Amino acid sequence: MLFDSTIRKELARSFGATLMVILTIFMTNLVIRTLGLAANGAVAAQDVVFIFTLLALQTLPTILSLSLFIGVILTLGRMYRESEMAIWFSSGIGLARFIRPVIATSWPIVVLIGILMVFVWPWSYSQYNDLRQRFEQRADVLRASPGQFQASGDGHRVFFVEKAASAANAGGRNVFIMNDLGTRESVAVSQSGKIENVGNDRFLVLDSGHMEQNDKVSGEHTHVEFKNYRVLAGTGAAPNNSAPSPRAVDTVDLVLTGGPAYMGELAWRLGLVLGATNLLFMGISLSAANPRRASNWGLLFAALAFVIYYNLLNLTQAWVGNGHVNIVVAMVVLHGLAFALGLGLIWWREHATVIHPMKLLLRRSAA
């Protein structure tokens, strides 16, 4: 049908343009965030691209949902402003008739959001947590980036390596170490160094260098030259037996395991999928605009509705996660009311009638 094909083409074009703009904004922020993590020594420099990919996958469901919502608002809002909606309405097509082409265009995106939330979301968080954990368990000198000072985990030592060490070839040149032991501090500089594993401990072995030691109490200063010097660089980490974060748990395991924290995470994952669907109905009703005015207040109300809805999703996750509300009750109340509100607004826009309480009383008194 001409009507369905027209709406679907316009919506697909608007969704694509909106997605590109929002992706550019979000990806730019993610690049800055990821580079900041690497610069602060929170992640390894060689893992920046993979971490950026994981963070992008985590934000993609929200980006798709927001792009779809704005795409509906922009498409129908333009049709209102250019009086195309008046033509469709005069042809006997009501606002509720727009639901079918909007759903027909949007359902692949909603399914993709569901796949991302059910399968990709926990996998990306699991991979991200594993990378962070493995990096934190590495020796302090192994975490040093070339040309950058790296503080140890306890904050008592500072390392500088001109050529960073690696797990395969644990060597470096022009190594600098400052060690603060409270009452004494020392600075060691060597031409080269390497990592040696002794049991669960890692030692940094320095060759051909010198050390300056200073006693803060007595002020005594000592200069020592050495051919070989060994300093503890890190210890083997104990196995992590703690329960995994709910965000890193598979969706099936969330259902089987139960528990408030897992149910809260499940409410969030399912809520994003249901929220993307409900926002389509809200977008149809909030896109109305006056063709005689250049402004589109519906877009402002739509942005406000999106922010409120997603804040309620976070609030619902917290309530369910703390055990205050049952997940079924929370899902029915939040998403059921949002669905009813979307359909109610469509009905109100289509009929364009509001029964004022005073008019209702006057009708009853006249009768």
Residue ranges and their predicted role:
Residues 1-81, 366-367:
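Membrane-anchoring signal-anchor transmembrane alpha-helices and their immediate flanking context
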Residues 229-254:
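Extended, hydrophilic extramembrane loops/domains of integral membrane proteins
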Residues 54-155, 343-346:
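Internal alpha-helical transmembrane segments
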